[in-house]
Amino acid sequence: MPLTRYQSRNEYGLADPDLYQAADKDDPEALLEGVAMAGLVGILRQLGDLAEFAAEMFHDLHEEVMATASRSHGLMARVQQLEAEFPSIEKALLCQTDHSPFFSNKGVEWHPNLQLEQSVVTSGDLPRCVMDSYEECRGPPRLFLLDKFDISGAGACLKRYTDPSFVRLETSSYEESWDDIQREKKSQKAKRRASQWRNGGTPENALSSHAKLHELFLEEHLEAHHSDPARVVKLKTRKLDGCSLISKSGESYMEKFVQTRVDSKISYEIITQNPGLLTWNMDSARDVVTDIPEISMVGAMDKSHGGSRAEVSFPSEQENVANVNMNGGFIEKDIETVPESTYNEVRGTTITQDSQTVLNGKPGFFQQRSYSEDLTSEADNYVDAPATMESETETDDECRPKSRSDTLKDGNHHIYSDAVEERMEDPPQFSFSHSNGNTPVSENGRSSFGKKSTSYSYSDTASISIDDQSDGEKLSGCLPSTSSFKSELVDSMSHVTPEANKVSHDLNVQESVSSSNVDGQTSLSSNGTCSSPRPVSQNDQSCSLTVQSLASEVVETSPELVRLDLMKGGNDGRKVDPFDSSKSCASFDAKNSDLPSETSSISSTSEGSRCDSTIEKNCMVASNLVNSGTSPQAFVDSQTGKQLPIADTDFETNSIVACSEVLANSGSDPEERDGRCLTGKLVPCSAGVGMEVSPDTPSKVCGPSSADGIHLKDTLDDETDCVSVTNVVVDVDSKNSVADVGSQSSVADIDSQSSVAEISDEHSCAFGNTADVSVSESHEDTLENGMSVPSDFNSGVEKLAGDASPTCSKCDDHISHEGFHDLSGLDNATTDIVPNVELDVSDNDNDTSSGGVNHAVSLSSTRGKGSLPWISTNTYQSSSDAGEIFHDTVVESDGTLLEDNNPESEIKMHKSPLEVSSEGLSTEPDNKDVESIESTSPKPSLDQRNRDTETKSPGESILDDNCIDSTQVYNLNLLESEAIDQAVREQTSYASHEVADEELLQSNVFRGLEFEPQSAGLEFAPQSAGIELNRPKQELNLDPTFPSFGFIPETIPPNPEDMPPLPPMQWLIGKVPHSFPTFMGESVETSSSALSAAPPIGSSLNVQIGSPPSELSVSLGSDESERLPGGFVHNASEKPLQSSIQFPTMSTDLNSQYDSSELPTIPYQECIEDFGSEENNLLADHAAQNHELVYSQASSLQLPQVKHEDFKDDADVHESQSSSDDHHCPETKSLTPTQSTKVEDKGHSVPDASNAETAESSNTSVQKINPVSVGDAMWPVSCFSVAPTLDTYKTEVVPTVRLPRPRSPLVDAVAAHDRRKMKKVSEMVHPPIKSKQDDKDSLLAQIRNKSVNLKPAVTTRPSIQTGPRTDLRVAAILEKANTIRMAMAGSDEDEDSDSWSDS
């Protein structure tokens, strides 16, 4: 009841508080009256609520009573009805004599036709709750509307679609049909057995009981495996020439049928990871088998390590049996369907395919080959997948020729394409591309090559495709196998650990097995990494997939990693575990471990002339193999199957490439870190071999290179992956220019791996082949540039090979251990070489390759120091690479290179970019550089970019060391002028290059200038060279920035090792180092050239680019400008080069350059701080030494110098940042160049009017660079301001930024960035903002006026309401209270009033 709830409350609390609150508290009477009134009102309210509640309750009770009464009346009526009806029912029941119907009838039939309602007691058929749901539901489908269209008339449709009898009828008919089928099947089989016996059965061996037993087994088998008769295929019986139950071997049928294992005589060719059904297309309709499940040998690969030759014996299909090797080895595999076939061993052909092998372009399927000898077709034997196994076994035993068993016995799978059979057609259709045991990844765990026999299932029809009945020569497309066998492990190379094999997994398994390459090349069906989705062998030429002789089917594994099963590898009988995993090409090496990396080289060189894609791939593979192999290498003639000895020197480059490729293969599979191990093994040979690619060899490679590029492209959709790996190896393994063929952006991606990634874009560079091809292209480019690339390259590379071979080997091993993607893990020098100096490592090869691609620069920058100068002349990238390489080498070598001061090298550099580069390659620094690289390589902590920078550093530092000791300024000037000239020449030559002209120009200018400045920078900064080694390119940039090393040494920044790495300035600035990745491989090299040329810095490089060589030199002005570019250009060049590539047409606007410089200037506060102290001194000294003549350019250069000095102090941090952003310290360098550019632009445009245009044009390039540099540049604002102070007073403002240098570089960078943007935006936006502001102000004023007008009313109203309302209410209440009191008082009014008043 409500009262209970309200009792706890004050009675008057229920009433309006105004009733008593208004009373005067000082007047007790008034207060009491108010409280009394409130209490009464509350009580009345409670009573009213209670009355309402009671009314509702009684109403509900009334309704319930009425409902109960109604139901009771209904019950009474029903009871009465029952009483009336029951007697009749009772009578009927009692009258029945047989009560059995009660137990059998369905319920109402026994009633005497008396229909009663279901619910006798309740009124409805269903409970109300259920009826409600029915009422709410929709009605039945209005099928009656269709009755007019039905012949049966009204209600037919509803009945037809709701009658369950229809379903029952269908089921019964189905069962009947099933029974009929079973009966027919049994009778047919019995007849067939009898006919076979009649046709020549030998009763002594095969008894009638055997036939009966077989029939029973078969029936049970079918019943067990086929519950659905509709799926059972009825086969037509045909008479065979021999006893069906007795095979020629003399064993009874039951013997074989009961055996769980089959003798070596019986083997099954195909195993698919996908146990999908194979449809055989046979000419004869009677032979057609609709569905034939293939035998799945998926497990074999994994367990194949142990066996000799693994052959799958065929037990009954229903049981998954460990296949017994023909040789006694066993492979545990599930045999889902075992089409029996003989293997025709084709020596030297690797038909092997991993689970990834795809037939007819269909992954996971191997075409099955029917017996080609006595068995015209096994199709008749297949009733079903399960039935097929059994019947096939039976027929195999019965009809299988001895020769088939014999072929299997020898342990080699031989597929006989005997024409004896009528059904020759069928075998081709079913020809298998490989047998697991024979696959390079053999089921035994040994490559088929190791077995000496390549089981190449060769049938008259080479077509792998099931449907394709054409000749085997035809690859029905690359049959990429989606599934990958674990047999890759089987393919484990002797050099590769099982893990590596596993790692190589599908990609490696993908190795394309071409039995005989059309070119007779190494069966390098696929590159180490054929990551492209399409199989390498899509084009017969493109891959060795096309098997010339027995290559009826070259089963290519998925493009991930087509592995080359050397046709010859098997023929030698060597147990070569193809580097199925980490190196597809490695498989060749693994196979011929004795074949050094040169094998691939041989393929490319010897076979290269063929220019077949196979060659390219073979070359690539050979490279991988070569890497795995020892220095001596042999080329395997695919056709002859003989190994061709090849000079180590000839294949040094190739072997390195191969090594690189092997690394690429191992690295190409990102998952395949184990490949590192493989690669490491492969690499050693390359260490011995300096990846020396003679011009001839490169030319050969180049010849096939074009074809290779195409084929590789086809072959490698994911070339980048493969290429990347190759590049890494190439760079590391040798001064291989392989990587450069690809686009620069590839290099950026692959930079961590190596420039080789670029090959992927170019596609001309396959893996190992890519290296060769790239080298070839590089040589051509070098020649184009007028360089003696071949001789220099060969000699330089050889020297490098000799000098740096330990480093290469180290790098290669490191790479192999690290995995392709772990290039960062590689020795810093090597790694640096690989990503940025990949071509650099390649020495001249790389440079040569650079012609083909901007990354030729990377190729150019060789690990060998001597190579570097040589490279610089090869192409724009060559010279730049040379400088860059030296620069990087300096960075990488760090102290080591600095220790190696070779004036000769510097002089060479000064001589001319071409001369210097060629000489430099062969200069003393090679050994030291190698050492430096090796010593530097221990700096894997640096980003790959850093490593690249470091790698380049060593080369660069060679120059630095040499140049620093020798005339610093003079050499710098010489180098600058020569580099400028070369840059101009390179610009011209590269303008026509496929690479963007501007991009090339920038890189050329960078390279040329960089080369000069490199020597200059080297000259000035022995210390900075050391610093640079520590922080790749940054220190060197600082040194070149400063006029002379003498002054710079004071401000030598601590070694990067000593300094904590700073985050990339780009990060601080918030810019993405987009250009870095692309140019890491090239850009770093470019950076080295950038260092030598001042393009990134601004007008120096710009002038060089835009101006003739002489003008460029003038614009550079003095050694300072030269050095400054050397230091700055390296960083700027990396980024600017990328930038230039990215922004081919950049306005040479001084403002934009200024902005770019300014932005980079802001990034490093530390630089600013150091800059403040050292910058002024250094700049002053620098300005003093470097002539005021070039003060505009020089000052801009000086500015970066000062920044560099700051960076020297902050170099390590800066280097880390730049290395993280770039692969090297490009950020630092970029920053340096950027600021330099900024200052230079201003100074250059002001002081060098003659070079203004040139500077402008170069600024255009530089700006292209600058966007990157800006993002990457980490120059502190103070640094930038210093430069303006020296060069021009435009940047006087920067000192202000320097003041806040305590702030983080990020803040400065943001401030500078914002400031620059604000300037632009402020000019454009201010007027509109003002107008908008005015509009807003006017609107606001109007609104305010309106609101002010409205406010008074609002305020007045509330004030008025409060007082009077209360008074009125109180008065009214009092009046009412008085009235009530008066009424209650009645006759006692007077007394009451007295009492009230008294109280």
Swiss-Prot record:
Organism domain of life: Eukaryota
Signal peptide: none
Cell location: Cytoplasm, Cytoskeleton
Biased composition (Basic and acidic residues): 398-426, 568-580, 942-953, 1207-1227
Chain segments carrying region Disordered: 178-205, 371-456, 502-542, 568-611, 896-961, 1102-1139, 1207-1261
Ranges of biased composition (kind: Low complexity): 597-608
Disulfide bonds: none
GO annotation, cellular component aspect: cytoplasm; cytoskeleton; SCAR complex
Keywords recorded for this protein, A-Z: Actin-binding, Cytoplasm, Cytoskeleton
Protein's GO biological process: actin cytoskeleton organization; actin nucleation; cell-cell adhesion; positive regulation of actin nucleation; trichome branching; trichome morphogenesis
Family statement drawn from the similarity comment of this UniProt entry: Belongs to the SCAR/WAVE family.
Role played: Involved in regulation of actin and microtubule organization. Part of a WAVE complex that activates the Arp2/3 complex. Regulates trichome branch positioning and expansion.
Protein's UniProt name: Protein SCAR2
Originating species: Arabidopsis thaliana (Mouse-ear cress)
